[in-house]
Amino acid sequence: MYPAHLLVLLAVCVSLLGASDIPPQPLNLYQFSNMIQCANRGRRPTKHYMDYGCYCGKGGSGTPVDELDRCCKVHDDCYGEAEKSQNCAPYWTWYTWKCGSDGPQCDDSETGCQRSVCECDAIAAKCFAKAPYNDANWDIDTETRCQ
């Protein structure tokens, strides 16, 4: 084997070792993001919902700050119910849906866990599209406002 080949092989191995420390992203969040874009017809980027209020984004506590934040709390609760009643892993559950004229629609062939998680996401995406967005509630200090 040529020395150049060994260097390339070593570089690939080192790259893979470094990548193993990066946590995988939940597959479902990609679908949920697309559902949000379907529901709001691309009027607001999905990232604007990732750190909003007390419940939009990772975790959640306290009282929702507004209607949009309530949508996120309902979504969190819906995922919690799917975990309990369907023994689901909502963040990892892949489902089939389409973007219709009324917004996201879950495929009728989906049942059980996939159906539950899809409905949680579709309902939340439609709720996001209807709720007003208050820039002052993005990236708030959750330690003081979400008790």
Curated annotation (Swiss-Prot):
Keyword Nucleus: no
Signal peptide (residue range): 1-19
Free-text tissue specificity from the UniProt record: Expressed by the venom gland.
Cell compartments where the protein resides: Secreted
Stored Gene3D superfamilies: Phospholipase A2 domain
Co-factor: note: Binds 1 Ca(2+) ion.
Record's function text: Snake venom phospholipase A2 (PLA2) that inhibits collagen-induced platelet aggregation. PLA2 catalyzes the calcium-dependent hydrolysis of the 2-acyl groups in 3-sn-phosphoglycerides.
Disulphide bonds in the chain: C38-C99, C54-C146, C56-C72, C71-C127, C78-C120, C88-C113, C106-C118
Cofactor field: Ca(2+)
Catalysed conversion reaction: a 1,2-diacyl-sn-glycero-3-phosphocholine + H2O = a 1-acyl-sn-glycero-3-phosphocholine + a fatty acid + H(+)
Catalytic residues identified in the record: H75, D121
Keywords assigned: Calcium, Disulfide bond, Hemostasis impairing toxin, Hydrolase, Lipid degradation, Lipid metabolism, Metal-binding, Platelet aggregation inhibiting toxin, Secreted, Signal, Toxin
EC number: 3.1.1.4
Sites where the protein binds Ca(2+): Y55, G57, G59, D76
Propeptide section residues: 20-27
Single GO molecular function: phospholipid binding
Record protein name field: Acidic phospholipase A2 S9-53F
InterPro entries linked to this entry: PLipase_A2, PLipase_A2_Asp_AS, PLipase_A2_dom, PLipase_A2_dom_sf, PLipase_A2_His_AS
Protein family (similarity comment): Belongs to the phospholipase A2 family. Group I subfamily. D49 sub-subfamily.
Enzyme class, spelled out: hydrolase
Source organism per UniProt: Austrelaps superbus
GO cellular component: extracellular region
Database matches in CDD domains: PLA2c
GO BP annotation list: arachidonate secretion; lipid catabolic process; phospholipid metabolic process
